[in-house]
Amino acid sequence: MTAPTKMTFFSRFEADILAGKKTITIRDESEKDYQPGTTVEVSTLEEGRVFCQLKILSVEPIAFSELNEFHAEQENMTLATLKEVIQEIYPGIEQLYVIQYQRV
């Protein structure tokens, strides 16, 4: 399978990504094929507006129940907020993937 070359985020996360405050994203199985070492074009989900490029550092499986304060810190939010956001986006999904990245 070819590694994805694009990634989208809700526009509300753009400022944190650009400021380096958000350094991971948590996705479901449909987005687990990002490959470490590749660079992706990043755009807003709502408008499709490109706002940066990210280098994928790692892709690791994680269960929703294993999310902790460290993940929340990397997402620049509290653990309670992180879990709430994940449940809104991926209701009822236990198997997730942590994608770590850096802006290039």
UniProtKB/Swiss-Prot annotation:
SMART domains: ASCH. It comes from the Bacteria. GO terms for molecular function: hydrolase activity, acting on carbon-nitrogen (but not peptide) bonds, in linear amidines; N4-acetylcytidine amidohydrolase activity. Residues 7-93 form the ASCH domain. SUPFAM superfamilies: PUA domain-like. Gene3D superfamilies: Hypothetical protein. One of its GO terms (cellular component) is cytosol. Its EC number is 3.5.1.135. The keyword Hydrolase applies. The active site is at 22 (proton acceptor), 25 (nucleophile), 75 (proton donor). CDD domains: ASCH_yqfb_like (cd06552). Disulfide bonds: none annotated. It catalyses: N(4)-acetylcytidine + H2O = cytidine + acetate + H(+); N(4)-acetyl-2'-deoxycytidine + H2O = 2'-deoxycytidine + acetate + H(+); N(4)-acetylcytosine + H2O = cytosine + acetate + H(+). Keywords: Hydrolase. InterPro entries: AC4CH, ASCH_domain, PUA-like_sf. Catalyzes the hydrolysis of N(4)-acetylcytidine (ac4C). Belongs to the N(4)-acetylcytidine amidohydrolase family. This is N(4)-acetylcytidine amidohydrolase. It comes from Vibrio vulnificus (strain YJ016).
